[in-house]
């Protein structure tokens, strides 16, 4: 229902316009207060790169963060990541991730980024606190903040926006009548706009999510996902249909697709109940970090990597590395 409202297919968005105007006024006032100097943002002693969205919902932001971390690591840059840790609840903040940190404590995306890249990761509702903690523990040259484009209390040197190339900005309205956290005109002020799927427009960086081999949660064995049979597909991400479409494009045709809420807590019994006798469960990598502790033999995940095309990605990386002292 919410997807139909935000796309404009359902006329119900009109009923939510008063709340959207209120959201827009408040969010605009907050940004303006920092722009005019009434409020002061905290500036870190190292460059900060924000990777965020203008819209709510899954746009492919986490794969972009992983891509950026790995590219900077390849250039010898010491990079760390901070996040709000949405979906997790730690005993105390800021929380520096370790191999023992769970998604219940830190949230699924920070744990995924930590496991995939090996980079230091810290979470806290107040991102400045996370930055201070991670810099106290590690000698880093640059910080990437996973989400937080609208978190103006933390000053930033580079802003990168990730856009869903198929859904774009829906009906163009602020939350809750539409998907917008800020108006599309905000794109004029960011350093780069990366478009996940669809058709990138002038000045935007095209990106595709490239699937790898399916990985068994228990053994780490790998195989072509099309070789798996009797598949039940599960996706607890911002836009589950994208994952199901990826499976189809890989030649894997699920018998059943189970969309879950983004950041949803997954109880072992609930996940186990999805799979019948002789069936194979295939999930996203973000779901896998929550399920690995209680995984069964026939559970697999399909990793995806961001593939950015054209000359602009290299120019963006050169711009970012030029800030490193």
Curated annotation (Swiss-Prot):
BP terms from Gene Ontology: lipid A biosynthetic process; lipopolysaccharide core region biosynthetic process
Record's catalysed reaction(s): a lipid A disaccharide + ATP = a lipid IVA + ADP + H(+)
Sequence positions that bind ATP: 55-62
Highest rank taxon of the organism: Bacteria
The UniProt record lists the keyword Glycosyltransferase: no
Enzyme class: transferase
GO molecular function: ATP binding; tetraacyldisaccharide 4'-kinase activity
GO CC annotation, single: plasma membrane
InterPro entries on file: LpxK, P-loop_NTPase
The EC number(s) this enzyme carries: 2.7.1.130
Pathway the protein takes part in: Glycolipid biosynthesis; lipid IV(A) biosynthesis; lipid IV(A) from (3R)-3-hydroxytetradecanoyl-[acyl-carrier-protein] and UDP-N-acetyl-alpha-D-glucosamine: step 6/6
Alphabetically ordered keywords of this record: ATP-binding, Kinase, Lipid A biosynthesis, Lipid biosynthesis, Lipid metabolism, Nucleotide-binding, Transferase
Keyword Kinase among UniProt keywords: yes
PANTHER family the record matches: TETRAACYLDISACCHARIDE 4'-KINASE (PTHR42724), TETRAACYLDISACCHARIDE 4'-KINASE, MITOCHONDRIAL-RELATED (PTHR42724:SF1)
Role played: Transfers the gamma-phosphate of ATP to the 4'-position of a tetraacyldisaccharide 1-phosphate intermediate (termed DS-1-P) to form tetraacyldisaccharide 1,4'-bis-phosphate (lipid IVA).
Family: Belongs to the LpxK family.
Protein name: Tetraacyldisaccharide 4'-kinase
Organism: Salmonella enteritidis PT4 (strain P125109)
Lineage: Bacteria, Pseudomonadati, Pseudomonadota, Gammaproteobacteria, Enterobacterales
Gene for this chain: lpxK
């Amino acid at each position: 229902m919410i997807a139909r409202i935000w796309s404009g297919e359902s006329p119900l968005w009109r009923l939510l316009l008063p709340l959207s105007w209120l959201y827009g006024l408040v969010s605009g006032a907050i940004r303006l207060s920092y722009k005019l100097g009434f409020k002061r943002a905290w500036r870190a002693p190292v460059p900060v790169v924000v990777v965020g969205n203008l819209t709510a919902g899954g746009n492919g932001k986490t794969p972009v963060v992983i891509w950026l971390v790995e590219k900077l690591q390849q250039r010898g840059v010491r990079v760390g990541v901070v996040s709000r840790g949405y979906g997790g609840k730690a005993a105390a903040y800021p929380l520096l991730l370790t191999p023992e940190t769970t998604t219940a404590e830190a949230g699924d995306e920070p744990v995924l980024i930590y496991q995939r890249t090996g980079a230091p990761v810290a979470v806290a509702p107040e991102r400045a606190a996370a930055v201070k903690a991670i810099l106290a523990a590690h000698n880093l040259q640059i910080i990437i903040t996973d989400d937080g484009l609208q978190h103006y209390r933390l000053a930033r040197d580079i802003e990168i926006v990730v856009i869903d190339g198929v859904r774009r900005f829906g009906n163009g309205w602020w939350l809750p009548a539409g998907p917008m956290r800020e108006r599309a005109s905000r794109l004029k002020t960011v350093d780069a706009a990366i478009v996940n799927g669809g058709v990138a427009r002038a000045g935007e960086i095209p990106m595709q999510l490239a699937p790898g081999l399916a990985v068994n949660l228990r053994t780490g064995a790998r195989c072509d996902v099309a070789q798996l049979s009797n598949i039940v597909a599960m996706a607890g991400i911002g836009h589950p249909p994208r994952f199901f479409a990826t499976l189809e494009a890989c030649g894997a045709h699920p018998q059943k697709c189970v969309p879950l809420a983004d950041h949803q807590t997954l109880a072992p019994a609930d996940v186990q109940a999805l799979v019948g006798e002789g069936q194979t469960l295939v999930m996203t990598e973000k779901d896998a970090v929550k399920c690995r502790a209680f995984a069964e033999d026939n559970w697999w995940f399909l990793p995806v990597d961001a593939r950015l095309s054209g000359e602009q990605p290299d120019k963006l990386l050169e711009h970012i590395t030029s800030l490193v002292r």
